[in-house]
Design a protein with these regions (language model features):
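Structured beta-strand/loop patches that form or line metal/cofactor-binding pockets in enzymes
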Residues: 1-44, 50-54
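Metal- or metallocofactor-binding catalytic centers and their adjacent structured scaffolds
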Residues: 6, 38-114
Length: 117
């Protein structure tokens, strides 16, 4: 079992080696949100999701707001299984699929590390 102690959210923008042109959209950088989840035993898990209003409908700012909301629902929770992670995140907020995936991947990464899988 793991207990969530801390969740940090990082907003990054990485320049692309080549510009992507899609319809009326030109993409020159990759905007992503990185999520680090730390347990009470100081182990960490990481997750990431890209933000793109033109592809996913989610902006970095919106993802950060959603993650701050989800974060408050998860801090100090005890988690034993991937199923619990999924249920906890799905119940926390409607929509916001990219934001949810970033924190879900971080939690699954952390759970796997604590279970040595």
């Amino acid at each position: 079992m793991l207990k969530i102690k801390e969740i940090t959210i990082h907003n990054i923008a990485l320049p692309l080696q080549e510009t992507i042109r899609m319809s009326k959209v030109i993409i020159e950088k990759s905007n992503s949100i990185l999520v680090k989840v730390k347990s009470t035993d100081d182990m960490s898990g990481w997750g990431e999701a890209a933000s793109s209003l033109s592809m996913t409908g989610e902006s970095s700012a919106g993802m950060i707001l959603a993650l701050e909301y989800i974060k408050n629902e998860i801090i100090n929770k005890e988690i034993e299984s991937v199923g619990e992670i999924y249920e906890l995140i799905q119940r926390s907020i409607y929509g916001n699929y990219a934001a949810k995936s970033a924190i879900e991947v971080a939690l699954v990464d952390l759970l796997a590390k604590t279970q040595k899988k």
